[in-house]
Each structure stands twice: as C-alpha cells, then as structure tokens.
C-alpha cells in the first residue's frame, strides 16, 4: 500500500494480498495494531468505500465456523459501475472477533483483564461477484476464511505482549 495510506491508518503492520484458485480471486487485507491504544484506528468499510465512490449494501451479520473457532463478521456487497464485490470483515481482539469497533473495544478490555496481549486487527476478505453468482462469492469467502483463520488465530494468540 502507499505510505500515506499506511500512515493514515496508523498501522503497525499489514498484509494486503490476493489468492486465486481457477478463476476465483480472494483478496485478504489485515491491518494490524500492537497496542490497545490503536483499537478503533481501523475504520469500517462502511466509511471508506463510499468515500471512494462505491455503493454499499445494508450490512448483515455473518458467522463462519472454522476449526475450533467461530468468526463473527459483517457482510456487505459493494458496487462501482459494473464491478461488484462481496466483503466479509471483522475486528480481532486477541482470541475474539466482532463485526464492530465497540465490541472490539470490549473484547480488548476482556483480553487485558486476562493478561493477554493487546494486539488487535481489522480483517477484510473480498471476492469479486461474477455475473449474478452472489452465493458462489459468499461460499468462496467462507471457504477461504475456514482455511485461513486457524493460522491467523494461532498467530494472534501466540504473540508475546508488545
């Protein structure tokens, strides 16, 4: 990402990468923060996408069950011209996920009470919607999260306090 974006988001670290299988492409973005002071530094896609000219659907709650965990997320569809994407996103505070920053703050406080690291993150999984195949895009996002999240969870929960 461009340096001014990294600075604007006050990121400590990030990952922005696309993965493909056949014609399906899944894009993963993780904005990572080392301290609780930065909880809320990441903002919801409901803020940034309209500012970039995207139309967004009404968010709906989403839940993805993975090996040993459940990811509580928000799902939206965005459109700009003919391009449409399905997005699942959540905020991570130690071992808990939430679709919004208020619950992220509560989860981070709970982690602190348990003497866990203050690391937190914003995670976004995007899949281009091809034709009218919204369900296919949603399934691709869910399958990706099921494969990706256990490794991410392990990374987040095994960090030493910063």
What label would you give each PLM region?
Residues 1-8:
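Solvent-exposed beta-strand/loop surfaces of large extracellular or lumenal domains
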Residues 10-160:
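A cross-kingdom signal targeting lumenal/periplasmic-facing segments of multi-pass membrane
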């Amino acid at each position: 990402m461009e340096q001014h974006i990294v600075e604007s988001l006050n990121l400590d670290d990030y990952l922005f990468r696309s993965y493909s299988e056949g014609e399906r492409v899944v894009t993963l973005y993780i904005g990572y923060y080392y301290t609780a002071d930065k909880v809320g530094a990441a903002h919801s896609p409901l803020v940034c996408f309209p500012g970039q000219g995207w139309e967004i659907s009404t968010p709906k709650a989403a839940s993805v069950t993975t090996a040993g965990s459940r990811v509580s997320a928000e799902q939206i569809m965005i459109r700009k011209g003919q391009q449409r994407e399905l997005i699942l996103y959540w905020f991570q505070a130690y071992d808990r996920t939430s679709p919004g920053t208020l619950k992220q703050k509560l989860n981070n406080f709970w982690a602190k009470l348990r003497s866990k690291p203050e690391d937190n993150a914003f995670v976004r999984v995007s899949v281009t919607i091809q034709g009218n195949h919204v369900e296919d895009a949603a399934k691709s996002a869910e399958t990706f999260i099921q494969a990706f999240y256990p490794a991410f969870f392990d990374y987040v929960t095994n960090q030493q306090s910063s």
